[in-house]
Amino acid sequence: MQSTILNRNLSATLNDLPLKGKRRRHLRAKPVNPEHKRMMIETRSIHNRPEVINNRSTFGHWEIDGVMSPQDSQSFVITFVERKTRFMVGVKAKSKSSDDVKTAIDTFMSRFENVCDSITCDRGTEFTSSLFIYSIEDTYGKKLYYADPQSPGQRGTNERMNRELRRVFPAGYDFTKITQRKLQNAIQDINERPRNVLRFKTPEKVFTKRIMAA
């Protein structure tokens, strides 16, 4: 009975993700020179990521990526995939600006902060601003890791899930045309598909069980 209630609450939580997170200490992007920026990224290299994250032996470590609209539209979707359970969340962002990306991060953290210990992302401009780094590490106290350039396989879980999302919203789809609710309904369908890697359980079921055990 408790599991059923939690599943319903989780579905409601996902469907009702707001377009902005709860208010946090306001941060501003600080200008950094290219060399300093390079060092900020290199010191957070995926090669420094602990083995317990690499081998998926612990819960709460997420891969994130951007799923883009056409070039004439700034809106895009940031996807979050928990590595151990393959559970996926998507949040719309108005643009790739540091402020709009931070708003999307705040939205995600407003629901999943307690089950997020680290984030691994690529080196796209939306994820390498000083505001993004300070938001993840200073505001929320999470570890941040960057994959190597041109290495999508280092975030293979996220890439595979994004391909499934693209079957619903093909390349070139303009995400300004959908609501956050419609996006999450599509992602919920993905989360309810049994996975061989999860012994034919669904990401939603495995994720929910982990939350209950926390």
Language-model regions, residue ranges each:
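Short, structured coil segments at secondary-structure junctions
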Residues: 139-140
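Two-metal-ion RNase H-like nuclease active-site motif
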Residues: 59-69
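Active-site beta-loop-alpha junctions of metal-dependent nucleic acid enzymes
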Residues: 70-73, 90-112
